[in-house]
A protein has these predicted regions:
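Conserved non-transmembrane functional hotspots
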Residues: 2-41, 80-83, 87-175
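Alpha-helical transmembrane segments and their immediate juxtamembrane boundary regions
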Residues: 32-92, 161-193
């Protein structure tokens, strides 16, 4: 293989490593945010459940009892979901992986500066890193592409629309999940007065 072809192949591999590195950073951030969000929801729902229990003791209203049961089921679901998704451990593994990918990327830059293209060795290390942790999602890769100045213009309009639609729907869902227990507490408090 001539030197020019070797350099092009090496740059292509270097770009793949960079894209994977950036996508994994986005994935790790999403996993950490999901973990924090679940903790936040657990706290909000537990506080609201405690308030509903106190209202039930004071008032004994059946509707408040139903609200309490409903909130209890949601709390149980949140805890079960949080335990099965294991966001914190997945975040730690993903962060470790992207840090190693970052080191590999800088190793590539150094090899390119020195014109020492050990493609097989770099590719093997890259493949090993890909196999040590779950893959990033298509959504995370799309997030990378939409935030990268060189990739942004290459994303088709339909993918942009789907991305922003999903992002909007997730925000609406998060707001609804946040508002539900507060609504029940307010209604219960009004019924108590």
């Amino acid at each position: 293989m001539d030197e020019e072809m070797k350099e092009k192949e090496f740059i292509n591999l270097e770009n793949r490593i960079w894209k994977t590195y950036q996508s994994r950073i986005i994935t790790a951030t999403r996993l950490l945010n999901n973990s924090k969000l679940l903790d936040f929801y657990s706290t909000i729902y537990t506080i609201c459940l405690t308030l509903l229990s106190v209202f039930t003791l004071i008032n004994g209203d059946k509707l408040i009892n139903y609200f309490s049961v409903f909130i209890s089921i949601i709390v149980m679901g949140i805890v079960f979901y949080g335990n099965t998704m294991n966001y914190k451990d997945r975040y730690i593994n993903m962060k470790d992986n992207y840090l190693k990918l970052g080191n590999l990327y800088f190793k590539c830059l150094n090899e390119r500066i020195n014109k020492n293209y050990d493609i097989e060795k770099i590719y093997e290390e890259y493949s090993n890193l890909l196999n040590t942790v779950e893959n990033h999602s298509k959504y995370d890769y799309l997030s990378y592409r939409l935030n990268d100045i060189n990739e942004k213009g290459k994303v088709p309009l339909l993918q942009k629309i789907i991305y922003w639609f999903r992002k909007t729907m997730l925000l609406i869902l998060k707001i609804i999940i946040f508002v539900i227990p507060i609504f029940f507490v307010i209604v219960s408090f009004i019924r108590m007065i």
